[in-house]
Design a protein with these regions (language model features):
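N-terminal secretory signal peptides that target proteins for export/translocation
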Residues: 1-19
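Mature extracytoplasmic/luminal segments of secretory-pathway proteins
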Residues: 3, 14, 31-33, 111
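Bacterial N-terminal signal peptides
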Residues: 22-33
């Protein structure tokens, strides 16, 4: 989902170049390294993080309470009452991480799980970018309960539950499909602005980030129609809900937009300094949590609408707060960390 060719290849070339195997190889390294650095943030502004004194910390200051090995590239997370589930598209499976034993247990094997995970109506819902369908599974055992012929539009398209339904964007043009959780059938298809992804349910509405339109789109489940649009930061992508608000991570400038879930009005734009592709945002433990490569954990205080802690270093890509801990994937390290983060 968010794997960087430049990161892995650059590391290989660095080792070879340091060994000075040949002038030609050194020149190749320099050319590719420069290209990768130019492309590493994909044309977005440079990540700077937050420079306020006392906010920034090194990831080396955190010691995991548990480390879960997950083969492949662990990515999307979903929380249940006693565990978390994590996808690994490259390994073609979804793994249950038991929050009591701190060990992985059940494994669901399916082709290229992607585009998020949702918990709702007694099930775990898994979009597949391989079989292009929606898989419904038991959240305790991982047993597959149903396969619904609706596929995600994008590997980062997102999925959510609410109003008796599962919602996911199924075409890049874009179309929001509503799947009835009682019948496992599509009961509505809703046209969205092109380039809209990552639905989330909050209040009485479904909210979707319009990545191309720089807006947060509101859908009314009672009518299955778009009923509002709130201008927010550039290239909005990932959403979470908490404290009566929808929080949006804007990839274009690395800010977080806070939108009132009742009125649809923009309440705050918070500088975070983490622009670029990838990343995620979550709410829990009274805080908003964001992650991107290089800045694995950013903590926002919703009472202040500002970043109060930010950790720099290796790790990151998907984040949740659950069972009294921060759960963080290390996409390139084939593991998930369970962390106790100190109070701000």
């Amino acid at each position: 989902m968010r794997i960087s060719f430049c990161i892995s290849f650059d590391r290989v070339l660095k080792v070879k170049c340091l060994a000075e195997e040949s002038l030609a190889l050194t020149m190749l390294f320099l050319a590719l390294s420069c290209f990768c650095r130019a492309q590493e943030n994909d044309g977005f502004p440079k990540k700077t993080g937050v420079t306020e004194p006392g906010v920034r910390h090194s990831m080396s200051e955190l010691s995991p309470d548990a480390v879960f090995p997950v083969s492949g590239h662990p990515d999307w997370l979903a929380v249940t009452d006693d565990a978390l589930w994590v996808t690994s598209s490259s390994a073609n499976h979804v793994v249950r991480l038991d929050a009591t034993t701190n060990k992985p247990d059940a494994v669901i094997t399916l082709e290229k799980p992607c585009s998020g995970l949702a918990i709702g109506y007694g099930s775990l819902w898994i979009p597949s970018c391989g079989s292009h369908d929606l898989v419904r599974a038991d959240p305790k055992t991982g047993a597959i309960q149903a396969r619904i012929p609706v596929g995600p539009a994008d590997s980062e398209g997102g999925i959510t539950s609410g109003a008796g339904s599962i919602w996911l964007v199924t075409s890049a043009s874009s179309e929001l499909d509503r799947v009835n959780a009682a019948t496992n059938t599509v009961e509505a298809r809703i046209e969205l602005p092109r380039g809209s992804f990552n639905p989330i349910f909050a209040g009485d509405s479904v909210w979707v980030a319009s990545n191309e339109g720089n807006a947060l789109v509101r859908v009314d489940p009672a009518t299955n129609k778009v009923v509002g649009s709130t201008p927010i930061g550039p290239k909005p992508r990932f959403l979470t809900v908490g404290e009566g608000s929808v929080w949006v991570l804007n990839q274009g400038d690395g800010t977080v937009s806070r939108v009132d879930a009742a009125t649809g009005k923009l309440r705050a734009t918070i500088p975070v300094g983490i622009p670029g592709l990838g990343g995620e945002i979550a709410f829990g433990g009274g805080s908003v949590w964001a992650t991107v490569f290089g800045y694995p954990i950013t903590r926002i205080d919703p009472a202040k609408n500002k970043v109060v802690q930010q950790w720099v270093g290796k790790g990151g890509d998907s984040i949740r707060y659950a069972h009294g801990s921060v759960w963080l994937t290390f996409l390139m390290g084939a593991k998930v960390w369970r962390l106790k983060v100190p109070a701000a």
